[in-house]
């Protein structure tokens, strides 16, 4: 089921649980572009400043509780383009490195 929620920090934007980002004022879905590693990013404006943010981080911050205050997000199915909430999990940096090492041998 598709759901849109306001991002907790970037309050001018709605985040879809599947990985789309929409400007609340214009209603337009923002275009993304990929960084050097192939992860989608988007430019967000807040208080007159523009910041480039990874889409997976916006989805995780909006939809996935983070009671342990981890700062790293892992793509469960190893597809960096699948930014759906069910494919993301918070973890610590060292755990994410273990996942990445394991991925090299899959």
Which role does the model predict for each range below?
Residues 1-73, 77-106:
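Conserved recognition-core residues within compact binding domains
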């Amino acid at each position: 089921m598709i759901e849109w929620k306001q991002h907790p920090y970037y309050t001018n934007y709605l985040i879809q649980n599947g990985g789309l980002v929409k400007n609340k004022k214009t209603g337009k879905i923002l275009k993304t572009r990929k960084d050097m590693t192939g992860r989608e990013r988007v430019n967000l404006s807040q208080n007159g400043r523009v910041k480039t943010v990874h889409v997976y981080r916006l989805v995780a911050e909006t939809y996935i509780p983070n009671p342990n205050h981890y700062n790293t997000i892992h793509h469960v199915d190893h597809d960096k383009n699948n930014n759906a909430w069910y494919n993301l999990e918070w973890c610590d940096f060292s755990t994410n490195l273990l996942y990445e090492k394991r991925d090299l041998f899959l």
